[in-house]
Amino acid sequence: MEYWLNAKPDDPVAFAAQVTTVCEVYQQAPAIAEQGGHVLSTDEKTGIQALERAAPTKPLRPGLVERPEYEYLRHGTQCLIANFDVATGAVVAPTIGPSRTEEDFAGHIAQTLATDPDATWLFIVDQLNIHKSEALVRLVAEACGIKEELGEKEKRGILQSMSTRAEFLSDVSHRIRFLYTPKHTSWLNQIELWFSILVRRLLKRGNFTSVEDLRERILAFIAYFNKTMAKPFKWTYKGRPLTV
């Protein structure tokens, strides 16, 4: 198998520096946690389907493999926004809803901050536009007590463009800040590794009678994962994939 789309940065030196920065933050996460701070790998898993099998799965028997029914009843979809705590391996303050808007993401971050309001927070996120939104800038400015004039979206100041908003959100002097991974580097964000666990352990073989059932089962799995399975991922990136 050969991937057809890989990161081909315009500036390989800058790209390498960004990757190195993320790797260094992962290595620093335990020390940051010891000082009361949080390093979270954050992203959305969209389009999670509430699929109910049209007939019961026939269980494994001597001489016979398990036989699932492949006809489904479709009950809708949900979006999970999750934070993977790099230092502890726990999934923190997940939110699940029908959409992924800038308000949804800002609300998720607000809910996360509320778990430890005075702590330092570093969120590792990708380049999605909702991770550089006006709502997020206003949230961070208020939470950090920043009185600076923010300007106006598409016209002036911090709010003018995605690049100006990203510059503000990634300011290392802020108590709450965001670190952006380069484009086409989902492998660099540890939450993606946890999403694969969610798929294998729950979603792939799941049977969900409604979106409410799906939401409750995901939250129950997260609680179970945090209690029995959570541990930091072993960071091995030297041109190779992540390993658990």
PLM region spans:
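Acidic/histidine-rich, metal-coordinating catalytic segments
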Residues: 119-131, 154-156
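Electropositive, glycine- and tryptophan-enriched low-complexity nucleic-acid-binding patches
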Residues: 60-122
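Short glycine-/polar-rich loops that comprise or flank the Walker A/P-loop
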Residues: 36-37, 119-120, 172-177
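RNase H-like polynucleotidyl transferase catalytic core
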Residues: 67-72, 143-190, 206-208
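Mobile genetic element proteins and their domesticated derivatives, centered on retroelements
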Residues: 41-43, 83, 89, 109, ...
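Charge-mixed, compositionally biased segments that are often intrinsically disordered regulatory tracts
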Residues: 1-74, 244
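C-terminal anion-handling pockets and recognition modules
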Residues: 174-180, 184-185, 192-244
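Short catalytic/ligand-binding loop motif for oxyanion handling, primarily in non-cytosolic enzymes
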Residues: 48-50, 130-134, 187-190, 241-244
